[in-house]
């Protein structure tokens, strides 16, 4: 409940990074009220919210409201994109979903031009279903959109369909080499530069851990990271949730 979230946020203390995720976060009716409690009580420096772009007006109104209310917070809106056009619709099993992303991006870009504390990113998941087409998807996004960052997530953890996981190391490296090459030419907003550094380290660690089964560094889950579910359950990280 909102009252429970209020009490919780009053005890958490200041946050460096806050991620508000789903499912689709903007589907929740109280999402604005929940966000405001975190922003007011935890004073995060950086906020990341992934979205499928399906609720264009709600997404736009949300960011317009909070960009004006909290000018010291750096917001990152991340569009989840798995393919182009019909391919994305098929992978998401929702007809017209890619058009929704285009509509939401175009409307959000007007805010990006006005507010320096907003970055627009895309994220795609590297799986067995996408490994052969993902490079083409990323090249299309780079040519037809103006995202601050284009990132790739490696399928991991408790994924319902284990067949979606893959060990195609060569393709993963090729795709991330491309991502690395285009990042160098992008505008350097503060959140953009931070995310590029994080993405670079993450890519290296995924190759070592996911493909080469190497130990990289001690786990900090539960110490520097915590995950709170929509029901209030607390976990040290996504994997252990």
Language model feature labels by segment:
Residues 70-235, 239-241:
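Radical SAM enzyme [4Fe-4S]-AdoMet core and its adjacent flexible, acidic
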């Amino acid at each position: 409940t909102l009252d429970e979230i209020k009490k919780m946020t009053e005890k958490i203390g200041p946050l460096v990074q806050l991620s508000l995720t789903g499912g689709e976060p903007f589907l929740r009716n109280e999402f604005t009220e929940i966000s405001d409690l975190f922003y007011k009580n935890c004073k995060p420096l950086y906020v990341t919210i992934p979205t499928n772009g399906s609720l264009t007006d709600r997404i736009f109104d949300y960011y317009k409201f909070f960009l004006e209310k909290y000018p010291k917070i750096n917001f990152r809106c991340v569009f989840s994109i798995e393919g182009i056009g019909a391919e994305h619709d098929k992978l998401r099993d929702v007809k017209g979903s890619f058009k929704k992303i285009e509509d939401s991006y175009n409307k959000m870009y007007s805010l990006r031009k006005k507010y320096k504390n907003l970055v627009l990113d895309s994220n795609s998941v590297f799986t067995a279903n996408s490994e052969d087409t993902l490079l083409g998807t990323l090249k299309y996004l780079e040519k037809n959109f103006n995202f601050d960052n284009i990132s790739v997530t490696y399928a991991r953890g408790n994924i319902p369909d284990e067949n979606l996981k893959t060990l195609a190391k060569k393709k993963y490296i090729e795709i991330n080499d491309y991502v690395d090459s285009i990042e160098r030419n992008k505008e350097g907003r503060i959140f953009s530069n931070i995310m590029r550094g994080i993405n670079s380290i993450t890519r290296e660690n995924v190759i070592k851990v996911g493909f080469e089964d190497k130990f990289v560094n001690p786990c900090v889950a539960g110490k520097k990271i915590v995950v709170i579910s929509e029901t209030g359950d607390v976990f040290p990280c996504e994997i252990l949730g």
